[in-house]
From Swiss-Prot:
One of its GO terms (biological process) is response to nitric oxide. InterPro entries: Globin (IPR000971), Globin-like_sf (IPR009050), Globin/Proto (IPR012292), Leghaemoglobin-like (IPR001032). Phytoglobin that reduces nitrite to nitric oxide (NO) under anoxic conditions (e.g. during flooding or in waterlogged soil) and upon root nodulation. Required for general plant development and during nodulation, especially for the onset of symbiosis. Monitors nitric oxide (NO) levels during early phase of the nitrogen-fixing symbiosis and buffers oxygen in functioning nodules. May not function as an oxygen storage or transport protein. Has an unusually high affinity for O(2) through a hexacoordinate heme iron because of a very low dissociation constant. This is Anaerobic nitrite reductase Glb1-1. Heme b binds at S51, K65, H69, K99, H104. Binds 1 heme group per subunit. It catalyses: Fe(III)-heme b-[protein] + nitric oxide + H2O = Fe(II)-heme b-[protein] + nitrite + 2 H(+). It comes from Medicago truncatula (Barrel medic). The gene is Glb1-1. The lineage of its organism: Eukaryota, Viridiplantae, Streptophyta, Embryophyta, Tracheophyta. Residues 8-157 form the Globin domain. Keywords: Heme, Iron, Metal-binding, Nodulation, Oxidoreductase, Oxygen transport, Transport.
């Protein structure tokens, strides 16, 4: 179930993703937080999807639960992108696609949320590696993200 056709992800795209990920990896905690701050700036209502943010009076960047969550999402997204061509499918560490799909279903994540996240991810990467950024790199990360999202969506149903 967790495998998807990755023919759309070329060797050139893989090289761009790997090169930029290698440059960003050491800052993944900071970049993950930037990603989520961008998401909430674009769509403030998305904060309601996170139980640990619902009634929090703490500024987002100081929230002790947001930082580790943001880092793990950023890491998983980027590492999934790097592995895409090598493994021929979307691979995720830590948590299975079934669990990711069930959680996204349970919390009411919809297509628009994935679109906002994609935009925020591409902006975060663009700011992280401006000297490498190009239309080709944007397309490579966009393709990798779309394939991860399609894999998650294929598992978005109530957990059994």
């Amino acid at each position: 179930m967790g495998t998807l056709d990755t023919k759309g992800f070329t060797e050139e795209q893989e090289a761009l993703v790997v090169k930029s990920w290698n440059a960003m990896k050491k800052n993944s905690a900071e970049l993950g937080l930037k990603l989520f701050l961008k998401i909430f700036e674009i769509a403030p209502s998305a904060q309601k999807l996170f139980s640990f943010l619902k009634d929090s009076k703490v500024p987002l960047e100081k929230n002790t639960k947001l930082k580790p969550h943001a880092m793990s999402v950023f890491l998983m997204t980027c590492e999934s992108a790097v592995q895409l061509r090598k493994s021929g499918k979307v691979t995720v560490r830590e948590s299975s696609l079934k669990k990711l799909g069930a959680n996204h279903f349970k919390y009411g994540v919809v297509d628009e949320h994935f679109e906002v996240t994609k935009f925020a991810l591409l902006e975060t990467i663009k700011e992280a590696v401006p000297e490498m950024w190009s239309p080709a790199m944007k397309n490579a990360w966009g393709e990798a993200y779309d394939q991860l999202v399609n894999a998650i969506k294929s598992e978005m149903k109530p957990s059994s």
